[in-house]
Amino acid sequence: MMDTAPLRDAYRALLNAAATVAESGDTSPAPPAGEWNADQILAHVALVNAATITAVSSAATGATTTYDNRTAQDTWTLGRVIALSGGNAGLRDRIRLQADALCALGGPMLSETELDTLVPALLLSNGKVLVDQPVPLRDLITGLAEVELPGHTQQLLALLPEDRGTRATT
């Protein structure tokens, strides 16, 4: 059985960062050039979560699956997910529920054999191919906990005004 505590911790950190940014008083923190705003980051995470839930569910049924994160980087799709979720608070709720689902599905539900299922994967970041080969399902799940979610947590925190820490302590 896979230990999903690191995944749950990564989601908790991401959601705490998202709440901090939302509560910062800046209703739309400006991202650095070429980066996403907070809602776009959260929509991307929600889409990645949905793709991961699909892969996990497919493995549990014995169905063939693939994992492709290109849709999670499409600007139109991000905007649609933001609108359908009802904005920032809705995105955070969606991610929280997806986190609960992934931690339940990826932990006690899957056997070691299912976690070792090879999933053809295409993972891009900033237009560059990171992975284009089959990977074990467990690596998709641990990749969320170890790379994807912490990276987006930092991306969210980078949206905070630089004097935020100063104001919070004075």
What spans do the regions from the language model cover?
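Short, helix-capping/interhelical loops that line the mouth of catalytic, cofactor-
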Residues: M1-A5, A51-A101, D163-T170
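Alpha-helical scaffold segments that form or flank carboxylate-/histidine-based iron centers
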Residues: M1-D9, D26-V48, L78-R94, A121-E148
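Serine/threonine-rich low-complexity intrinsically disordered regions
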Residues: D3-P6, D26, T66-T71, T77, ...
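Structural signal for well-ordered, non-membrane alpha-helices
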Residues: R12-A22, N49-S57, R96-L110, L149, ...
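Helix-loop segments that flank and shape redox-cofactor active sites
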Residues: A13-A38, S58, G62-Y67, P108-Q133
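Residue-identity detector for glutamine
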Residues: Q40, Q73, Q98, Q133, ...
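A hydrophobic membrane-anchoring alpha-helix module
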Residues: L140-T166
